[in-house]
């Protein structure tokens, strides 16, 4: 119904209540005369008149397919309703659902259920209020009777029930429309004026953290780094800014640089460049003294050399938490709330992973035919928010961790931090091996179990199963040891086999000096896999119902030339054999580092047109990094070309940064879908790995600056003022899509540990929650919701946390390394006279210096401006600079 809405959320700076529903969606109160008082209603959306339906959303299961929208009700101007389109009824009544989650029913309370529902075809609808997951207890369900709908006739239902069970915070209000309930498809079902009323319940006040006008890295900045903030303002003139310390004293001031409309966020923005301020301290913040708004400030942040010192260990700890087949326990878990029993070790109710069969051939999702056999595939890492274990996703993740170690070893810092024995908080610490290799080995040992033996199937011996996962999807709020689903092996794939060959070859060379027996076994199995892939070069993991199945992600890949190149690179660097050298040198991907995937072919179909260098499905860049990093027998000119290609790709991303209002290295995709893709944050992280290598190989600090910009975007300098990392920032990630760390599902589950990064904005609307909560015309950078049900924007995965760990470690440890021919990043090159930092010395620098001396609020590079090198910037420097520009002085500094 169409009624005036009023804001009901109290705005309190500095306090954020972790709640299930995003304030931008639920904070508006309807005043419908048809419904009871909003504040006593357990539902947050009742009338749909604002054009959104969240937290109502749909669910598809067991063959069901549907779509939904909020639409105008014909013949009722101003009235809107939630419309569900049943496209395929599926096998069961729950195959198609519309539902509202996040409901707590309290014992002894009496509730009034009310809704109006209608359809354009004769059908039935089963409505219930009950548990979201096992055992699916129902507290109200119209006495188990579905409602009959007559075409075009509205049915209004009003019933009471008393909660006679213990208080339950895992409830949902659900309508089932599939299976035997459905009409002939397609058809529409409409819902409006829906309520769940309890006069004893009062909606809590939700405290909403305002978005400040000045967006910053909410954690902080390294002292030597380039430092930018982004100001949201439609002003076309520079704005005065002040930087204050924790004592509220102004320590620096200047004027913003207007940039105009930022395409990806649709914000009008300015930049603040405060790179020359290097004084370490905590609690700095910006103010805009001439801007008359309640949000003319920034969040507090630090300037410190140890910004990433703890974060890198938190990022690495994610992998211990995601281990399968081992109890997660203290003192390694970081807190008792994050401990759990071992998952999938063949103990009831688990049905894996000690004796997992190939996928049942009589199942509709069987896919490629397989012989029947069983395998022990215990161990490894759970991939993401589910309990699946996927070789291609595990491949790039474990490569990234091992590459961290290999780079550290080559750069001479493998004797400290996570690289040394005892450096990480894991059970294997102090066992004589580098801890990060111990963690990687947990995945490598699992990989070995996924390889097909001669006994199992001689026709594909040496090939590797693409993945192992549940037969059907499980609900959120389920620990691994509670998973009751049967688990099966999906068919082998060439991509998985080459991931296996690449990472086991990499593992072999890193372990040869620590555990020669293990290293030799890795290499033997890697070479067997290589030969198997050559024999079966086109077993693709296709995106079909058989390949994806209902219990795990598909990870489809229809091109494997990149994986062949990557595997050949790793095998060649490890063995030096001509077989691999000849293969990689004849590959179309030889020495390639994509700046935008698919430009030269060779990208997984899903990656074509996306800015970035590599993903689980596009892997040639990994091989090129190995060739550029590790000593090998390639011609020196080729190795230099690989390094140059790495720098060239990074240069293109630096150009993107200068074009983007929030200074990030990706832009909207250049494919038919455009916008930001699933896991957009991970594209930035992988770009930052390449930027790190560009700095290693060139010594040019501009690549370090690019890494700083990427981190600042991820940690809050973005269109949503969102830190996408748990435990870090004023507005951190709180509700990732995960089956254990899901307090939105139930209070009995813990909030996530710190150091986990979410996939981030995805403008392709690939889950019902984001589709229900965010309008389709929302700018790409703002297509995100911090909600546990939004798997397409808020998922967490091993292949995203791996580059996050890589980058945070790199930035934390960069002061330990000076790259060949480079400069110490703490002592950046001084270009005397270049006051405005544009790389040139001319009259504009004299103007900038004069304005600075006259205290006109301009920021300059004071190191460059001190042209007589006396440690001060004053009128003497201005006089010398003018003489230099007039060619009266030949060299600066001039004393």
From Swiss-Prot:
Region (Linker): 199-240
CBM-cenC domain residues: 40-199
Domain Dockerin: 828-894
UniProt keyword list: Carbohydrate metabolism, Cellulose degradation, Glycosidase, Hydrolase, Polysaccharide degradation, Secreted, Signal
Region (Catalytic): 241-815
One Pfam family from the record: CelD_N
SUPFAM superfamilies: E set domains, Galactose-binding domain-like, Six-hairpin glycosidases, Type I dockerin domain
Subcellular location field: Secreted
Gene3D superfamilies: 1.50.10.10, Dockerin domain (1.10.1330.10), Galactose-binding domain-like (2.60.120.260), Immunoglobulins (2.60.40.10)
Enzyme Commission number: 3.2.1.91
UniProt cross-references to InterPro entries, sorted A to Z: 6-hairpin_glycosidase_sf, 6hp_glycosidase-like_sf, Cellulase_Ig-like, CenC_carb-bd, Dockerin_1_rpt, Dockerin_dom, Dockerin_dom_sf, Galactose-bd-like_sf
Positions annotated as active site in the UniProt record: 386, 737, 786, 795
Upper taxonomic lineage: Bacteria, Bacillati, Bacillota, Clostridia, Eubacteriales
Any single Gene Ontology cellular-component annotation: extracellular region
Organism: Acetivibrio thermocellus (strain ATCC 27405 / DSM 1237 / JCM 9322 / NBRC 103400 / NCIMB 10682 / NRRL B-4536 / VPI 7372)
Protein name (database record): Cellulose 1,4-beta-cellobiosidase
GO MF annotations, alphabetized: cellulase activity; cellulose 1,4-beta-cellobiosidase activity
Similarity annotation: Belongs to the glycosyl hydrolase 9 (cellulase E) family.
């Amino acid at each position: 119904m169409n009624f005036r809405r009023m804001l009901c959320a109290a705005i309190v700076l500095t306090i954020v209540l972790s709640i299930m529903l995003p304030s931008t969606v639920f904070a508006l109160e309807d005043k419908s005369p048809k419904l009871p008082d909003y504040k006593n209603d357990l539902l947050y959306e009742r009338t749909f008149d604002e054009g959104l339906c969240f937290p109502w959303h749909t669910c598809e299961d067991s063959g069901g397919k549907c779509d939904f929208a909020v639409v105008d009700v014909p013949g009722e101007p101003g009235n809107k309703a939630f419309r569900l389109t049943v496209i395929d009824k599926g096998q069961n009544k729950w195959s198609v659902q519309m539902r509202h989650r996040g409901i707590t029913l309290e014992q002894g309370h009496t509730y009034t259920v009310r809704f109006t529902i209608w359809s354009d075809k004769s059908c039935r609808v089963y409505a219930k209020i009950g548990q979201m997951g096992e055992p699916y207890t129902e507290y109200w369900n119209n006495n188990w009777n579905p409602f009959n709908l007559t075409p075009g006739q509205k049915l209004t239902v009003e019933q009471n029930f008393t909660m006679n069970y213990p208080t339950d915070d895992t409830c949902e209000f659900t309508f089932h429309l599939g299976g035997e309930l459905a009409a002939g498809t397609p058809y529409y079902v409409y819902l409006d004026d829906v309520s769940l009323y309890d006069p004893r319940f009062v909606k809590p006040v939700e405290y909403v953290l305002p978005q400040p006008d000045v967006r910053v890295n909410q954690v902080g900045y390294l002292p030597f780094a380039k430092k930018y903030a982004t100001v949201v303002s439609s002003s076309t003139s520079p704005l005065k800014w002040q930087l204050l310390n924790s004592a509220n004293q102004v320590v620096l001031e200047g004027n913003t640089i207007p940039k105009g409309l930022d395409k990806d966020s649709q914000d009008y923005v300015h930049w603040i460049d405060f790179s020359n301020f290097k004084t370490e301290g905590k609690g700095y913040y910006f103010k805009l003294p001439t801007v008359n708004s309640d949000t003319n400030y920034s969040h507090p942040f630090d300037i410190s050399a140890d910004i990433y010192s703890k974060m890198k260990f938190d990022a690495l700890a994610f992998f211990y938490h995601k281990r399968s087949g081992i109890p997660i326990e203290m003192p390694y878990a970081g807190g008792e709330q994050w401990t759990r029993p071992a998952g999938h070790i063949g103990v009831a109710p688990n049905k894996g992973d000690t004796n997992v069969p190939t996928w049942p051939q009589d199942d509709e999702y069987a896919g490629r035919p397989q012989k029947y056999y069983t395998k022990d595939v215990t161990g490894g890492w759970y991939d993401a928010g589910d309990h699946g274990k996927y070789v291609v996703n595990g491949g790039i993740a474990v490569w990234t961790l091992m590459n961290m170690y290999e780079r550290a070893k080559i750069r001479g810092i493998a004797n400290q931090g996570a690289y040394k024995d005892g450096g990480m908080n894991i059970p294997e610490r102090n066992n004589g091996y580098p801890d990060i290799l111990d963690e990687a080995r947990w995945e490598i040992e699992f990989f070995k179990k996924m390889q097909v033996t001669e006994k199992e199937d001689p026709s594909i011996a040496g090939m590797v199963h693409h993945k192992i996962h549940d037969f059907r999807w499980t609900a959120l709020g389920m620990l691994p040891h509670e998973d009751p689903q049967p688990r099966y092996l999906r068919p082998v794939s060439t991509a998985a086999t080459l991931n296996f060959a690449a990472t086991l070859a990499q593992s072999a060379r890193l372990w040869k000096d620590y555990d020669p027996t293990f290293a030799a076994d890795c290499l033997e199995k890697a070479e067997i896999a290589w030969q198997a892939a050559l024999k079966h070069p086109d077993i693709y993991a296709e995106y079909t119902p058989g390949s994806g199945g209902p219990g795990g992600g598909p990870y489809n890949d229809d091109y494997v030339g990149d994986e062949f190149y990557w595997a050949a690179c790793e095998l060649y660097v490890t063995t030096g054999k001509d077989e691999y050298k000849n293969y990689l040198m004849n590959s179309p991907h030889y020495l390639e580092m994509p700046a935008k995937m698919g430009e030269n072919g060779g990208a997984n179909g899903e990656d074509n047109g996306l800015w970035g260098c590599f993903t689980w499905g596009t892997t040639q860049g990994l091989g090129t990094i190995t060739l550029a990093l590790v000593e090998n027998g390639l011609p020196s000119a080729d190795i230099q070309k690989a390094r140059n290609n790495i720098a060239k790709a990074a240069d293109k991303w630096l150009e993107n940064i200068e074009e983007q209002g929030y200074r990030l290295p990706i832009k909207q995709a250049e494919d038919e879908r455009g916008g930001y893709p699933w896991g957009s944050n991970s594209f930035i992280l992988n770009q930052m790995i390449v930027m790190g290598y560009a700095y290693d190989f060139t010594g040019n600090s501009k690549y370090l600056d690019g890494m700083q910009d990427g981190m600042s975007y991820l940690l809050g300098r973005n269109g949503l003022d969102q830190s996408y990392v748990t435990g870090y920032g004023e507005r951190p990630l709180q509700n990732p899509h995960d089956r254990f760390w899901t307090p939105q599902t139930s209070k009995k589950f813990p909030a996530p540990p710190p150091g986990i990064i979410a996939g981030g904005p995805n403008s392709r609307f690939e889950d019902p929650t984001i589709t229900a909560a965010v309008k389709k015309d929302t700018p790409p950078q703002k297509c995100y919701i911090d909600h546990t049900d939004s798997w397409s924007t808020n998922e967490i995965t091993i292949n995203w946390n791996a580059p996050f760990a890589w980058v945070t470690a790199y930035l934390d440890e960069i002061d330990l390394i000076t790259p060949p021919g480079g400069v110490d990043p703490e002592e950046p090159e001084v270009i005397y006279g270049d006051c405005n930092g544009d790389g040139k010395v001319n009259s504009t620098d004299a103007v900038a210096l004069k304005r600075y001396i006259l205290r006109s609020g301009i920021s300059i590079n004071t190191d460059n401006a001190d042209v007589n090198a006396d440690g001060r910037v004053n009128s003497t420097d201005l006089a010398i600079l003018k003489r230099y520009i007039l060619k009266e002085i030949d060299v600066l500094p001039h004393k």
